[in-house]
């Protein structure tokens, strides 16, 4: 089994926490906060961190899949958004996440793009784990906005 992924949160003040990523010396300490009125919004909140983790994992997985087929240096921009709603008890929950990955090149320039697109989501540990509880919709577009997946 692989090593566990560990982070440590240290309370600073109000609703702010410093997040230490441990054995990664290049990783800066991240300051989190919650949105007003409880916090000041001085850092990303938990929902933003969840969405960032899903988006980062998907983008990295797509890059990995593209590189498997000898596509190097494929620029991309990933945007993700969480939909929030209240459950039966009135508690706010993440109801869904939408992710759009826009490649910075034309689809026609990429080797075996169909194969890369067919498999990249399966490599994404975070997205597949989150999907057990939250729907995640993923779209990939090329540089002119042509939808490659739906």
PLM features: residue spans?
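Extended beta-strand/beta-hairpin segments
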Residues: 1-52, 60-150
């Amino acid at each position: 089994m692989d090593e566990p992924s560990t982070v440590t949160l240290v309370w600073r003040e109000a609703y702010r926490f410093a997040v230490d990523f441990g054995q990664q010396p290049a990783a800066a300490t991240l300051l989190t906060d919650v949105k007003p009125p409880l916090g000041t919004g001085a850092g990303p909140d938990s929902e933003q961190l969840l969405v960032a983790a899903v988006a980062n994992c998907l983008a990295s997985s797509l890059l990995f899949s593209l590189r498997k087929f000898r596509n190097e240096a494929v620029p991309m921009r990933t945007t993700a958004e969480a939909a929030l709603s209240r459950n039966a008890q009135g508690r706010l929950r993440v109801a869904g996440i939408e992710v759009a990955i826009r490649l910075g090149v034309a689809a026609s320039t990429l080797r075996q793009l169909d194969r890369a697109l067919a498999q990249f989501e399966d490599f994404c540990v975070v997205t597949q784990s989150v999907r057990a509880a939250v729907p995640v919709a993923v779209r990939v577009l090329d540089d002119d906005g042509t939808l490659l997946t739906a």
